[in-house]
């Protein structure tokens, strides 16, 4: 698998969104801070625009009010006729589409960085909806800038034809996910780390805009294979939970025959797949309602092509 060559047109319209989920507090408070102190997001060729994506859910300190905003930015929702009974997040998705889009047009923002926290032990994880070369080069840059801190890229290609995330409104985007952090809690270490990583990502965009050479390389990425539900009773209630041997081991190999769940009756449930997978978002609190105990991924080696050098030119923030 390899990604296609990407454009070297400079990225001048960049957004940093936080609070897409209103109880993921690093993004919430970074967005709030930058709305009052935007200088931290300025670079010579562009100034990233901070956005508090879901103000109502943020005020209520909940993931969402009516439906998941990060599943509501489809062209179907964005293009539908507004009604008074529309869910709040659908209304907000349309507002974000006016601000950052319109989705799928040349007028959309060049790049959106969406900030998230998870209760799972993912560490630093970039989530990309495509294997576009720029996103892989970005992840590689962060890995080289932070050799002691694992930074993994999780390729989450939506099933079907429609993308639905907040960053999908722009021409390109990526999600910066960090955990573990409880919902509604702000940890100083993760806050500082996310802030530093955002700075590094904006630095990379600036280097990209100025024509930095981006040679070809190889890297491991994790591609989503689907979800695994908890064991359940005939009535649909939980019959067990994540096994202690699996808990907190995100991005580590899970082999056939190894335990994945501990039933309340005491028995172990073993993984019955026929190949090694790499679980991600293990026991994520927000996924209980989605009937997801963890996501399965495959670890694949990709060859990322070089991006042709951009001849530096005078660029100013629009």
UniProtKB/Swiss-Prot annotation:
Optimum pH is 7.5 with S-benzyl-N-acetyl-L-cysteine as substrate, 7.6 with N-acetyl-L-histidine as substrate, 7.6 with N-acetyl-L-tyrosine as substrate, and 7.7 with N-acetyl-L-phenylalanine as substrate. It catalyses: an N-acyl-aromatic L-alpha-amino acid + H2O = an aromatic L-alpha-amino acid + a carboxylate; an N-acetyl-L-cysteine-S-conjugate + H2O = an S-substituted L-cysteine + acetate. SUPFAM superfamilies: Zn-dependent exopeptidases (SSF53187). The keyword Membrane applies. InterPro entries: AspA/AstE_fam, Aspartoacylase, AstE_AspA_cat, Aste_AspA_hybrid_dom. The modification Phosphothreonine is found at residue 317. It is a peripheral membrane protein. Substrate binds at residues 63, 70-71, 177, 287. Zn(2+) binds at residues 21, 24, 116. GO terms for cellular component: apical plasma membrane; cytoplasm; membrane. Expressed predominantly in kidney and to a lesser extent in liver. Weakly expressed in heart, small intestine, brain, lung, testis, and stomach. Changing residue 287 to A: Drastically reduced activity. Its cofactor is Zn(2+). Its main location: membrane. Pfam families: AstE_AspA_cat, AstE_AspA_hybrid. The keyword Nucleotidyltransferase does not apply. Exists as a mixture of homodimers and homotetramer, both catalytically active. Belongs to the AspA/AstE family. Aspartoacylase subfamily. This is N-acyl-aromatic-L-amino acid amidohydrolase (carboxylate-forming).
């Amino acid at each position: 698998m390899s990604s296609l060559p990407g454009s070297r047109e400079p990225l001048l319209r960049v957004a940093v969104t936080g609070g897409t989920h209103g109880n993921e507090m690093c993004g919430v408070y970074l967005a709030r801070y930058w709305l009052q102190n935007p200088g931290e997001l300025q670079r010579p060729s562009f100034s990233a625009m901070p956005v508090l994506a879901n103000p109502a859910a943020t005020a209520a300190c909940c993931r969402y009010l009516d439906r998941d905003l990060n599943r509501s930015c489809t062209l179907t929702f964005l293009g539908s006729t507004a009604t008074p009974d529309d869910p709040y997040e659908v209304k907000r998705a349309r507002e974000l589409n006016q601000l950052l889009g319109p989705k799928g047009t040349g007028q959309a923002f060049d790049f959106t960085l969406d900030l998230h926290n998870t209760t799972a032990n993912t560490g630093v994880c970039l989530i990309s909806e495509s294997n576009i070369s720029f996103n892989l080069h970005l992840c590689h840059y962060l890995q080289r800038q932070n050799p002691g801190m694992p930074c993994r890229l999780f390729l989450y290609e939506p099933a079907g034809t429609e993308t639905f995330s907040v960053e999908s409104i722009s021409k390109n985007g990526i999600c910066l996910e960090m955990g573990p952090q409880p919902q509604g809690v702000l940890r100083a270490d993760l806050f500082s780390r996310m802030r530093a990583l955002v700075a590094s990502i904006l630095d990379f965009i600036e280097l990209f805009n100025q024509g930095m050479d981006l040679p070809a390389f190889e890297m491991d990425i994790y591609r989503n294979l689907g979800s695994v539900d908890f064991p359940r009773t005939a009535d649909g209630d939980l019959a067990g939970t994540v096994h202690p041997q699996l808990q907190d081991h995100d991005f580590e190999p899970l082999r056939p025959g190894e335990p994945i769940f501990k039933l309340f009756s005491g028995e172990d449930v073993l993984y019955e797949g026929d190949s090694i997978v790499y679980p991600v978002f293990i026991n994520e609190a927000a996924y209980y309602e989605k009937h997801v105990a963890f996501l399965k991924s495959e670890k694949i080696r990709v060859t990322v092509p070089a991006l042709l050098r951009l001849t530096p030119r005078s660029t100013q923030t629009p």
